[in-house]
């Protein structure tokens, strides 16, 4: 999929009805001529709109309509004529969505990277990538870190459909990998959900739990989230108040308002630790799946070496 998406309406509803009626009641050629009448006056605006969203003409553009017919072919021709490298999706977006959903049903060699909140798992994933390991960064694609503070500092979340599209492409790119590292997540990441079939596969994969001391993780959380203003931190805590509990919520918010961010985060970390252990043990065959690796720091490079050494044993 493209790094960004742009909707270019070829026809408005009235124009679409006119062209469609001509195609059904007269013939294809008549419909094409009518379509060209509507399309012709929009060509320049379409090109200019694409220019606003692309860095240069060397950027590849994927053009699609719902079924991959003349509409996408016409726009692809126009952009190709202007100098862009263009391709279309055979069968249109409808076929692409069917392909997307099929990717979640396939088998993959997943390895789950686990650890309590604040264990620097995302940084460890990126460090594994630097060592030519295959990874899928679910939080990166979801634009959300998963916790109460997960949306802080992140761009807006994608729609569920766009999340699935990008996830399917990433799965396809790594389908032949010896192993694919994925961070242990809840099925819901902010406002998007990991597709059910894929979620089921992830829950059956080996889980490598990086066990890091509480104080190390607390320091990591403070460094990454303590920089945000009090209002944002309070709003984030309010989102989990039903699960966190009324007394704990009130205490944590008071700590933040008093400037004692460390104590507030300590309460939250204890909450997430309990929640994580409970969720982890809902897996079937957890005793067979779980591999615990002890570490004394959140250093991604050091923990990568520990992890890779462990799986070679």
Question: Which residue ranges define each predicted feature?
Answer:
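Short, small-residue-biased leader/transition segments that mark boundaries at the very start
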Residues: 2-3
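Hydrophobic/aromatic beta-strand patches that form the interior of the parallel beta-sheet core
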Residues: 6-8, 87, 111, 134-136, ...
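Helix-loop module immediately N-terminal to the HCX5R catalytic loop
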Residues: 16-18, 25-59, 97-102
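Catalytic cysteine-centered active loop of the rhodanese-like fold, especially the PTP/DSP P-loop
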Residues: 39-89
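Glycine-rich phosphate-binding P-loop
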Residues: 70-71, 111-130
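A short glycine-rich beta-strand->turn/loop micro-motif centered on a GG-aromatic cluster
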Residues: 82-97, 137-142
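Conserved nucleotide-sensing/catalytic segment adjacent to the nucleotide-binding pocket
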Residues: 130-200
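Conserved NTP phosphate-binding and transfer environment spanning the P-loop NTPase/kinase superfamily
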Residues: 200-207, 211-313
